[in-house]
Curated annotation (Swiss-Prot):
The keyword Cell wall biogenesis/degradation does not apply. This is Basic leucine zipper transcriptional factor ATF-like 2. Heterodimer; heterodimerizes with JUN family proteins. One of its GO terms (cellular component) is RNA polymerase II transcription regulator complex. Residues 46-67 are annotated as: Leucine-zipper.
Length: 277
């Protein structure tokens, strides 16, 4: 009887433990299912994101290939145009027939290019007698206000050069570009215009000297009548028809009259500059 009672107690304890174990197993199964669902949901989201990125990458690759083909086509057309159309980008050539046109395009505040003054100087030196009237208009002729005392000093130095003797006397006058650009040239022209009424012309040098009071109004009239505005285009025609005098420089040097002391006292600029005519 005692053995049977002890066996019954053991079976009751085993049943309780087995039930607890079953409950734990069920809980573990539910937790495992939840974790599996979470992992599967995350994996599905990552897979969908990866597929979308692959689609975008494929579209971008197609666009890159299209742009590369277009770039290659533009490069070929550019290469063909460079062979056909060659453009020279020189700022200013050495010799120009009718002046440098780049100077007109330059703004007023910026300086002129380096080759512009050289173009104007070479146009003034290498001008032939039969040149265009536009080129002759650039350099003022002997009809303008120019002191005749400067020509005898320039002609002996140029008489030994055969190239410079062939150039007309109009080219020996100062260039308007140099006189306008350099302040020294403008000051010299101003002083020459002041001395112009006192210096006798070549026609007056051949005549006997007259008193100073009578010579000033006549020289002023001659200076006003010899201006290019008064003479007009006839001055250039008469200059071409006049014969060239071979001994004009020596004749002017011999026939030049020294200024009177009254003129030197009246104008101290002449005495200080020591100008000899």
């Amino acid at each position: 009887m005692q053995l049977c009672g002890s066996s019954e107690l053991l079976t009751e304890t085993d049943l309780g433990e087995s039930q607890k174990q079953l409950k734990k197993k069920q809980k573990n199964r539910v937790a495992a299912q939840r974790s599996r669902q979470k992992h599967t949901s995350k994996a599905d989201a990552l897979h969908q994101q990866h597929e979308s990125l692959e689609k975008q990458n494929h579209a971008l690759r197609k666009e890159i290939q299209a742009l590369q083909t277009e770039l290659a086509g533009w490069g070929r057309t550019l290469h063909l145009h460079e062979r056909l159309c060659r453009v020279d980008c020189d700022p200013c050539p050495v010799l120009l027939p009718s002046g440098c046109p780049i100077q007109a395009k330059q703004p007023s505040g910026q300086p002129a290019p380096l080759g512009y003054n050289g173009c104007q100087e070479q146009l003034g030196l290498f001008q032939t007698p039969g040149s265009s009237p536009r080129a002759q208009h650039l350099s003022p002729g002997p009809c303008s206000h120019e002191s005749p005392g400067l020509l005898p000093s320039l002609l002996p130095s140029l008489a030994f050069d055969p190239l410079m003797v062939r150039t007309p006397l109009a080219q020996l006058s100062p260039s308007p570009v140099l006189s306008a650009s350099s302040p020294s040239g403008s000051s010299l022209l101003g002083s020459f215009s002041k001395l112009d009424p006192l210096i006798p012309s070549p026609q007056d040098q051949l005549a006997p000297p007259q008193p100073l009071r009578q010579e000033q109004p006549t020289s002023g009239r001659l200076a006003s009548s010899d201006s290019p505005a008064a003479l007009g285009p006839e001055c250039s025609q008469n200059r071409e028809h006049l014969p060239a005098l071979p001994g004009s420089s020596t004749h002017w040097q011999k026939s030049s009259v020294a200024p009177s002391p009254q003129a030197l006292m009246a104008f101290p600029l002449l005495s200080s500059a020591k100008v000899h005519f």
